Structure formats: structure tokens, C-alpha cells
């Protein structure tokens, strides 16, 4: 079991960001259950970059909490590269306050949520959303965090 993380800090204010150890801990709680070897990039960005990427790839004219870009290798190529997660620092901080969640718990949730997207999970259809949210809740609770959707229930 091996996870390789390329952590890129591309935001102006690095104060109070989770550590690389935090990110690795969250990834190790999720990925090995689905894929024993994995390589991925987590890029922490400001609202401007998140907004640009969200607009370019999703047609949404605003920044978002996490964007997932799965790597799709040709069928004949075996590679452990999962893809990239782009997480917007300001959106995560804002949402944690709005949802009355500890900031570290919300960071962990964004890593879990984005990782599941890289693994092929989605939440477009109601049934898929229920499955994904249930899995997120289970994984978060295994790490000692509360149900991330508690406020919505």
C-alpha cells in the first residue's frame, strides 16, 4: 500500500492550512480501501484560480470548494495516477463557518469528497448522491469526525 502525494500550495496565505501529514492521513483513510497504490496531486488555490477552473471546466461563474480531475489512462496503460484535486482555501474556510464545522474537519471532508470523485463516485443522480454521501459519512466517522452532512439532515 503506497500513496504518493504532490501537495502544491498556490495560495497567498499559507497560515493555518492543514499540514502535508494531515492530507496524507486523510488519503490513507480513504484510498487503500479502493486502490492499494495511488498517486495524486492536491493543489490549494485562491478564489481566482478556483473561479477560472470552475468556469472553464464546469461552466460555473464562481469559485468552488473542490474540483476533481481524474486521470484517464488508455486501457493498455497500467498506472497508479488517480488525478488532481484543486481545493479553494477561501471557499473551504467560508463553508466551515457557514456550516458551523471545525475547519480541519471540513478540509478532511473536501479531501474525502474529492478522492471519491477521482475514484469514480458522483452525486448527480439522487441514488448516486445517497451512496456517495453515505460513504463520505462512514469514512469521516472512521477518522473521528462528525457526519459532514449533519446540518442538512
From Swiss-Prot:
Source organism of this protein record: Aliivibrio salmonicida (strain LFI1238)
Keywords from the UniProt entry: Cytoplasm, Endonuclease, Hydrolase, Metal-binding, Nuclease, Ribosome biogenesis, rRNA processing, Zinc
Biological process annotations from GO: rRNA processing
InterPro entries listed in its UniProt record: MetalPrtase_cat_dom_sf_prd, YbeY, YbeY_CS
Family of the protein in this entry: Belongs to the endoribonuclease YbeY family.
Function: Single strand-specific metallo-endoribonuclease involved in late-stage 70S ribosome quality control and in maturation of the 3' terminus of the 16S rRNA.
Top-level taxonomy: Bacteria, Pseudomonadati, Pseudomonadota, Gammaproteobacteria, Vibrionales
Gene: ybeY
Protein name according to UniProt: Endoribonuclease YbeY
Cystine connections: none
Cellular component GO terms, alphabetical: cytoplasm
PANTHER family hit by this protein: ENDORIBONUCLEASE YBEY, CHLOROPLASTIC (PTHR46986:SF1)
